[in-house]
Regions:
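Consensus positions within tandem repeat domains that build extended binding/scaffold surfaces
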Residues: 323-325, 345-348, 425-427, 446-449, ...
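Acidic glycine-/aspartate-rich tracts in secreted/extracellular proteins
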Residues: 67-70, 83-86, 122, 164-167, ...
Length: 556
């Protein structure tokens, strides 16, 4: 009986343990079966995240998306709006495997917006959580630092930048200014041409005191208030500085004809050069003006292409003093050319009756003379110029062998440098020198060298063989001429219209000449002029063609 009881207990224990084992196996099988039955395509898990980079009108919307299984990335967008309906959409762009963003613009300032991330595969739409952000409020305008663009003795052009309108339309902008000695007494000048745009602004302040120090503040106004920028200091002076070409007339304003002396720096285009001519007494249509500018220093100026013609037909060229640029400027007496000048064209200063001095810069490589500068007394040249030199106010080439430009107003007597070997055409035309002495090494003269000059007496080079055509034509004050021993020929009109009283000829044989060589209009020099010839040569000259017309051939 006892054994049976023990046996019964053991069987119950075995049965219980077997049942538990079977249950565990069944559970494992069941779990395994559930995992293998999980679907391959699941809805993405999307989350709306906080907005960033929020301004008055823009914001960046952020979100995340988690893809499970073999689900493809759906099409995603952000819905947003000022109500929970969120009627506006913006395409979301994936920045990595899980993050998406969208930059939205055109928002209203100080406004709360609702937004959420939304995904769709064309059949099903999944929405994320809804969030909000608030745009920044509008502000007063923001300004950059002011600067001086250009200035004159009584005016200044100020430049400044409106960097931000603050989200509101700017209603007014300009500058405040005051004498530094009384900074609280500020004058306000509003821009009359303001377009309403942000960015670079310029403003002219005129009617300033000469040689005075000012404080200048830029300002801008909107519905949100007025912003006044940091002040800059500016002192007026006698010089004018252009930051941009074409501003000379604007800077001068009503004082255009008030200046007699002026220094100008900066770029000058055709518009500026036309204005400069007007200041010197010559208008755009070549008529006289009330301009009185007589002394101008352009050392720090720079001639640049652009603008309208400076004289009605000719345009400015970079670093070129063009033909007619200063022509007929009746007020001009002295000019220093821009230091970067490379070319001075023919007749750039034509018919400037009071121009006395011209300064040639180091950079000049080509200089041509101007006619009609009756008062021109001297031409100076920078010592650094490698193409020209100035000697006694006369412009010569670099090795001083050729005269380039002889100033018409130079008076008295003049002896040419011994280095000069030739003289070009019309070199002394219309000049005021009364007595000329040539070095004997000059062998050639150009045509019309002394035409219409005021010379009274001249000694020709001893080695000169030919007196060219029109050499002294129109020299109505020429009375005495000395011809060298090697003179062989006197060309037609060489002494035409010259009231000669004495001709000295050192040549043993009479130079070839004809009646036209001494052709005159008026006085008959053949009966009044004395011809002085070498001793023992009187009869030879009296028998020679051309010379025999003279009634007074003598020997000293």
């Amino acid at each position: 009986m006892a054994w049976r009881n023990v046996l019964s207990i053991s069987l119950r224990q075995i049965t219980s343990r077997l049942s538990w084992s079977l249950c565990v196996v069944a559970l494992v099988v069941s779990l395994s079966s559930c995992d293998s039955d999980k679907p391959d395509n699941l809805e993405p898990l999307i989350t709306t995240l906080s907005a960033t980079d929020i301004t008055r009108t823009d914001a960046t919307l952020n979100g995340s998306v988690v893809i499970e299984g073999e689900t493809e990335m759906p099409q995603m967008c952000f819905r947003y709006g000022i109500t929970e309906e969120m009627k506006q959409t913006a395409t979301a762009v994936s920045s990595d495997n899980s993050s998406v963003t969208a930059r939205i613009t055109g928002l209203s300032s100080a406004t709360t917006y609702y937004y959420m991330l939304e995904a769709t595969n064309g059949r099903t739409t999944v929405k994320g959580n809804m969030m909000t952000f608030t745009t920044l409020p509008n502000e007063k305008p923001s300004l950059g630092e002011a600067s001086i663009v250009s200035h004159g003795p009584m005016s200044v052009i100020v430049g400044y930048e409106i960097t931000d309108d603050g989200g509101e339309a700017i209603t007014e902008t300009g500058c405040l200014y005051a004498l530094a000695s009384d900074a609280e007494d500020r004058q306000r000048v509003a821009s009359k041409d303001y377009s309403g745009d942000k960015g670079r602004q310029t403003l002219l302040l005129s009617g300033l005191n000469r040689n005075a120090t000012y404080l200048i503040w830029p300002y801008a106004k909107s519905r949100m208030g007025e912003t006044v920028g940091s002040p800059i200091t500016f002192t007026t002076g006698d010089a004018m500085s252009l930051g941009e070409a074409g501003q000379l007339r604007l800077l001068l304003g009503k004082e255009l004809y008030d200046y007699t002396k002026l220094s100008i720096a900066g770029p000058l285009n055709g518009d500026d050069l036309c204005c400069l001519r007007e200041m010197m007494g010559r208008g755009f249509d070549n008529t006289a003006t009330a301009g009185r500018l007589s002394d101008v220093d352009l050392t720090d100026a720079r001639i640049v292409a652009g603008g309208e013609p400076y004289d009605g037909s000719r345009y400015a060229v970079d670093n070129v003093v063009g033909q007619g640029l200063f022509a007929d400027c009746a007020s001009l007496t002295k000019v220093v050319l821009p230091s970067g000048t490379t070319t001075i064209e023919k007749d750039a200063f034509a018919r400037c009756p009071y121009l006395q001095n011209i300064s040639i810069p180091a950079s000049a490589t080509l200089v041509l003379p101007s006619a009609g500068c009756s008062a021109l007394q001297g031409i100076s040249v920078s010592g650094a110029n490698s193409h020209y030199i100035g000697k006694d106010g006369v412009l010569l080439n670099a090795d001083a062998t050729r005269i380039v430009w002889f100033p018409m107003g130079k008076s008295g007597s003049y002896t040419l440098p011994s280095t000069v070997t030739s003289i070009g055409d019309y070199a002394f035309k219309e000049c005021s020198i009364e007595t000329f002495t040539f070095p004997d090494n000059i062998t050639t003269l150009g045509t019309g060298v002394f035409m219409n000059s005021k010379v009274k007496e001249v000694k020709m080079p001893g080695s000169l063989r030919l007196v060219p055509t029109a050499t002294f034509q129109g020299c109505t004050q020429l009375y005495v001429v000395r011809l060298g021993s090697k003179t062989e020929m006197i060309s037609d009109y060489a002494f035409s219209a010259c009231p000669l009283t004495d001709i000295y000829v050192d040549a043993q044989l009479p130079p070839v000449c004809k009646s036209l060589s001494f052709g005159t209009s008026g006085a008959n020099i053949f009966s009044s002029c004395r011809v002085h010839v070498p001793k023992g040569r009187v009869n030879i000259y009296k028998a020679s063609e051309g010379w025999k017309l003279f009634k007074n051939i003598i020997t000293d």
